Structures are given as C-alpha cells and as structure tokens.
C-alpha cells in the first residue's frame, strides 16, 4: 500500500512528488505530466513567475541549475515562455525520476483506513492518503 497517491501531474503534483521522494515516502503521481498546460495554455504565453520559482523544494533541480547546464542566463530567458518552462519541467522529471503512472482516476473510494483508487488502464491502487 502506498503512503500517498497524488492525483494530477501538473507543477504542484510534480513538486509534491519530488518532496515526498526526497523524504523517502512511498507514493505515486497519477496523470499525464503537464498535459493540461501543453493542451490548454495559449501559444506564445509567458509565465508571470521568474526563474526564482521552480519545482524543487530541495533547491537541487532549480530553474537556475537548468539554465546553468544550458549555458543560459536569467536575462536571456525572462520572461519565461511556456515552451521553455515545459522544457524545464521535462528536464526536472528526468533528473528526479518521479514515480508517475500515466493514467486517469475513474473511481476513488474512501475505505475504513485507506483509499481505493481505480484507474482507466485497469490498475487498482491503495493509499493511506490522497492529494488532489
């Protein structure tokens, strides 16, 4: 049984996953990473956040680290374009190897002391905690 199931693979779900992984808490993220952002954000969009905002609460796989690896400066990328941000998120996921199950939740039931989660790929997961 998982300690935590995270429903949603957007920025907050990925950030929480990285934090739980660092703390060695058993968990999985259910969803398709950044799918909503890729399919629904306007083409050519820029983020309001700057490079000091990133996914890694541990401060290891930051936007600054991503820029440094590519030989770029903050001034060259701010304001941050959506496509560049999505590239950072893909890099972040590669660096952290997060436990992501690319499926959708079809049923969520609270049992006496755990949650039973059914996914559209036929998988069934049990978790003590669920974060949506």
Question: Model regions: which residues?
Answer:
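Glycine-centered tight beta-turn/hairpin loop motif at sheet-sheet or coil-to-beta transitions
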Residues: 120-122
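Helical element adjacent to the flavin cofactor pocket in flavoenzyme catalytic cores
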Residues: 82-100, 125
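Short hydrophobic core segments
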Residues: 5-7, 105, 124-132
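Short, well-ordered alpha-helix to beta-strand connector turns
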Residues: 2, 24, 96, 127-128
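Glycine-rich active-site loop/strand segments that organize a redox cofactor
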Residues: 30-83
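Long, mid-chain structured domain cores
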Residues: 23, 99-103, 132
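N-terminal Rossmann-like FAD-binding beta1-loop-alpha1 element of flavoenzymes
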Residues: 2-29
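A conserved short coil-to-beta-strand element within the FAD-binding core of flavoproteins
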Residues: 101-115
């Amino acid at each position: 049984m998982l300690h935590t199931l995270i429903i949603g693979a957007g920025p907050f779900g990925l950030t929480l996953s990285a934090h739980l992984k660092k703390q060695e808490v058993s968990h999985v993220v259910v969803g398709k990473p950044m799918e909503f952002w890729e399919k629904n954000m306007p083409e050519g969009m820029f983020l309001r956040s700057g490079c000091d905002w990133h996914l890694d609460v541990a401060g290891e796989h930051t936007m600054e680290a991503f820029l440094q690896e590519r030989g770029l400066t903050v001034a060259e990328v701010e304001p941050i374009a959506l496509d560049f941000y999505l590239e950072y998120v893909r890099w972040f996921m590669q660096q952290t190897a997060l436990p992501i199950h690319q499926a959708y939740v079809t049923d969520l039931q609270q049992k006496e002391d755990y949650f039973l989660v059914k996914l559209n790929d036929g998988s069934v997961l049990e978790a003590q905690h669920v974060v949506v």
